[in-house]
Amino acid sequence: MIGATSFLNHSGPRPPRYRTPSPPRRAVEPISPFTTTTDFRASWIDRGDSQAASYDRDRVTSNNDVYSSTNRGSHGRTSHGRSSSTIDTLATIALATSPTFAPLSYRPPSQDPTPAMPLFPSQSIESTERPAKRPRSEKSPSPLHQPQTTVAPDANPSSTFDSMKTDAELLLNFARPSNFQPAAFYPSKRVSIDESYHPHYGEEPKSHFRAGLGSTYILPDGEKSAYHTSANTAFPASRMRSQSDGSAFISRPVIQGVRPNTSSSTLPPIVWQEEEGNAKTGPGPPSTKFPGAETRYENSVFTGIDTGADRASLDVPPRGDDDTESDENNQANCAACNLVRIPVDSEEQGDVTWISCDGCKQWFHIVCAGFKNDREIRTVDKFICRRCRPIHGQTTFVRKSSRARTAIDYAGLNQGLVKAASDSLEHHYIEPIREGKIRFLPDNFPRMRPELVTAEYFERGSGMTEPIVIPAHLNTRDSIPIVDPEFDSLVQEATSQEMFDELLEHLPEEGKDFETVIDCGQDQLDMVVPQGLTVRAVAELYGPEERVEVIDVKSQQGEDKRWNMQKWADYYESTGSKVVRNVISLEVSQSKLGKLIRRPKIVRDLDLQDAVWPEELKAIGDYPKVQFYCLMSVADCYTDFHIDFGGSSVYYHILKGKKTFFFIPPKDKHLKKYEDWCNSPAQDSTFLGDQTKECYRVDLSEGDTMLIPSGWIHAVWTPTNSLVIGGNFLTRLNYGMQIKVAKIEKDTKVPRKFRYPFFQRIQWYTALKYLEDDPIPQSVLNAFAEDENYRFHRAYPIYYEFGERENKAPAGDPYHNSRFYSQAELEGLPDLAKYLLRTALIASGYMVEGVTMDARNAVKRSIPKGQGDPIDTVRKFGIWVAWKRGNEKAPQWTRPGVVESNAKLSLTEKKPAGRPSRRSERNAEGQRMYAERQAVQRPLEQPPDLTNGLSSEESSSAPSTVEIPQSTVISTLPGTETKELKEEIAQKPRSIHRSSGLGPKRVACDACRKRRIRCRHKDEHNDTISAKQTTFGTFPAGVQSSLAHDAASALNSLAAIASEAGFQDAANGHGLERLEGSGNYSTAILSTPNAATSKVHDGSPEGLNTGKKGRSKACDDCRKSKRRCIHDEYGRIDPIKAQERSKPRATASAKRPRPPQEEDAAFTLNKRPKQESTSPVARPASLFRAEGDMSHTQRPVDLEASSYFGTAHDHNGIAQTKLTSAVGQTSYASPPAFQSDTVVMEVAGQGVSKPTASLVSPPTSQADETDVPPEQDAEKDNHVVYYTPTTSSRHSSRQPRHVDRYVPESQPAKAVKTTHTPSKRRASCSGPTTARRVTPGAQGSSKKPASRPSSSHAKKGVSPVTEKKFDRMTTTSTSPGHKGAKRERTAIADDEPDAESLRLIRELQEQEFGLRKRTTRV
């Protein structure tokens, strides 16, 4: 798309608004197809002079002397008088021209190039007339210069009269088309020629009439305008445009494929002849006015009618190659509106913007193409009109990158406000500042005499709140005369020592007010700076080869090249054009130059660092070195707006040259804008003073000294080469501002090297200095400790205690003050206390949100050692602040134990130092509000060996801590029912521990977080701690209900591991005897509907790694190497786990999660199931004998006596060991056999196993979550316990199903077979299911919880009460035959079921429970 090209020139200056087309210069505009010059001339001869009078509308002289006869003669036209434009005249002419009207019926485009007979053929159109549209180049010709095609006359004259009648009625405003909507918004009778036109955004061609005016041609049916370009014409791909024809866009109504109404009933009548005052001189048409707008000019426009409704392409009859006729006619038309423009002899180009279709090469007005203005066209890459879109596609636009770009202020560049990068070697603000283009407020800062600038002046006043200038003429180095000349002459005349001593004794009184000091060239500020110091001297004193940091002023960045003082001195002294560089950070306190400089006395008195830094550290040079800076700047150096590091105050003495400061006061709104400006990508091109609207200019010259208070934002310009000595210092007067600026530096990520060194340590030394110099009396300390609302009474603030109110209380008195405390100092003490509290919390191990481990370590190093606990120190300092301020309570956090137990302080487990996750660091900014709510987190130490479990008191002592799961262990004796059996334990939210305090609390496991997927393992995290609790004792009922869901999840996993891996000892079945003696393996099955036991202990055969988060039950090394983990939660080798034999591993394909549909073909029984249960529930169910009858002969077991402390009988071993095998794994089976959703028992004596127990009920049943009980009779009593959580893992579909194995005939009675189905398939079951199928015997019923819908399980002969009692027996009963479970498992491990059996089992289960397949996450 090419740039805009103007095709028409108007006479006179271009109006500021859109131009309207020029009005018609004749009573009636001809209505006929467009023809060539030859056809016009021929038809003119045929018609005679009678029509010529009508055609001569272009040069009218009557009633308008704008058009002269010379112009008419130039065109060879006969001069005619203009009609009076009455209705009668219009009707007469309309009827007279009716024989040549074209019929209203449209016909398809004619391919015959013969020209049509024109209504008013042109008498002559000279070739010398300028084209209306000037071609931009030969390769991009104008639409006007295309070969034109003539249209054959209509051969059907039958409709001539109808056409005449219709057009006459339309012309005379007697009729209107029914499908034309009136333009109701025209308020005036005066309207421009184009007012009937409105852009048609669909780009359908339309015909428009001009309310009986203008040069309008009407094409016959189906014919195109003569200037519709064909697709075969040599149009370039680019489009030529000029400025937009705004008048057309303003007023033309949208017409959807219909002929427009030209009736004057819808358009206001046009006044033909304007007043004489409106006529414009020159070769232009009479003007018309648009309502409310000034007079506009535009050329007359030809408009053709094009049906276009049933046309599919833009093909037009081929045109000749003769360019002469095109040049003579100089006409162009829009393919959408057929608007044809006839040129006038004008020197100015028109205001019409055109755009070319890249498909058909047709030209359109931008308003016809659907664009409002030129700005919209700039975004177009390839324009495709409506008819070409089915072929060429939609219009494409220039791609706009979403990458953030620095905005360039082109307006500012044009005005010279911002210099381009290559224009000058200086900073782009220098010239606007120098020329006064940037306006500043005049400063009203005080100019003070040096003797008034003292620490006492500021401390006893309101502090140092604004910059202070000590002019050079007031700060002289002359000594102050203390005696009069007469006394001095007497001293000179003294001839003996006695006479001299007598004169000293009678020294005048006025001299006693002065202090005699050594004259070392100090000024009245007691500042010593070597006179005559130069940059070369600085280089020699500092060291010619010493490194110096040089700033490139234009980029405000440090120079990459290495500079030394010798090179810098050479640069500074060089002349001519050079890159502007600056040195502003040369600290010289440790050099020879530093020993020649002394700061002003007020700076030394106010310097907080000098007052609190230990003297022993000063003696060895270990202190922050910010006292002396030497600033060397060449002319036109500029330092953009900044705040001195740490909010420090500044003293500034000009040795040579000049400096200009631009100050912005440190108001909160300005500090916020400053922070935003620092973080803005447009910082370099944005002048902060313009943003704040409050910027003061201060000019300093040689010898001037200035003190800049804390927090003042300032920029510095160097008009001439300058040499400055300055320094930074913290004060007691600005605690709040200094801490605020330090926070801004952190928020804006200022590099540490550009911050105040040891800032936090200075604050701590300050607090320690307060407590040491002015300790709190014990009585005051006790009063604050006894009453949290205690206020130390003071009659007036202590900053009033000077002069006649000076405090003279002795040391130890509650009202004693070791020194004077200023008002500004007392007001900043609470901010200092809060700042120290935060650092103390961080250093003491509290998990403060938004703090990385590196920051934590830095804070620890910043706190002075040997001062006791930082928390205790800051508590004491908080009380000290309340005591000194008086009449206020001590902060709440000073109360004993509040830091640990306050609800606003969230405590968490302390993690070892490690690199924080990148995601946490990225979220630090976004979690600032979260950090305020969760202020700190206290680590809760977990010893490796828990002997007594976690008491409920320990858990409740930290209300904001991460909830530690409590197991609910219920000793279920036969015939007893407990309330816990019916409890619904609500799951509590919990976070997974991290190595960093940044970001929100994690609730995702490691695996999901690394894969960046939604974690559904949230309930598995707390299984670790509750495992220990289950092992070592029974907890109170309140503790039992904390996280029972996690317990069920652990039990599920336990059974799954036991079922899939098994214990691979020898067939004698004594493999587990060595584990029973330890008492580690206890049965802890919950009888509550929504709760089950959590993990048991670390000594489970599976080797749990309870220190890991989420579902990762093994340590990282073992999990990655795919081997059995033998490590405990602390990474140490667990001897019990190490003694366990390796479990059989499945094939590699089984290790991979597979979709449910892929599990039809292959199942692997040994794959470790992964727990991801959101609300697991464990419930014991019924036991069945192989024959189907119930067995109630199990022995009740006391969990506290036998299970927990290792006194269990031998028949406890297998079941309890399997329970602890894999805490947190999703499974529903327990030793001694495989168990899951489908439980199949072998019938004794049969060689082929057949299902003896039912398929496990869907997860809506909570009563099915049972375990395999011990066997009463090793030969006969083979029982199966169903274990099904109510809500199971979402991802367990990736786990293989464990099905029943075939048992050899040698062990028919001990072969208890189960199949394991992952919980994910069962989790989706909510509808009713069929009854359990038990072959051949009876089955146990499922007790459904109150919170779940009925599972519709059949209960054959078993009442809920009996089942409940039996469930409790099965979970705790043992038998001697239990020891042989490992032999059974070893025997059956060799017999793998075939794939067909597995598939049938799974299909039966899905049919029964209505399970749906879930796709696995990849």
From Swiss-Prot:
SMART domains: JmjC, PHD. GO terms for molecular function: DNA-binding transcription factor activity, RNA polymerase II-specific; histone demethylase activity; histone H3K36me/H3K36me2 demethylase activity; transcription coregulator activity; zinc ion binding. Residues 44-60, 127-139, 308-321, 907-925, 1130-1143, 1186-1195 have a biased composition (Basic and acidic residues). It catalyses: N(6),N(6)-dimethyl-L-lysyl(36)-[histone H3] + 2 2-oxoglutarate + 2 O2 = L-lysyl(36)-[histone H3] + 2 formaldehyde + 2 succinate + 2 CO2. Its EC number is 1.14.11.27. Residues 1-86, 102-162, 308-329, 891-964, 1090-1118, 1130-1195, 1250-1394 are annotated as: Disordered. Its main location: nucleus. Binds 1 Fe(2+) ion per subunit. Keywords: Chromatin regulator, Dioxygenase, Iron, Metal-binding, Nucleus, Oxidoreductase, Transcription, Transcription regulation, Zinc, Zinc-finger. One of its GO terms (cellular component) is nucleus. A zinc finger (PHD-type) spans 331-391. Belongs to the JHDM1 histone demethylase family. Histone demethylase that specifically demethylates 'Lys-36' of histone H3, thereby playing a central role in histone code. The JmjC domain mediates the demethylation activity. This is JmjC domain-containing histone demethylation protein 1.
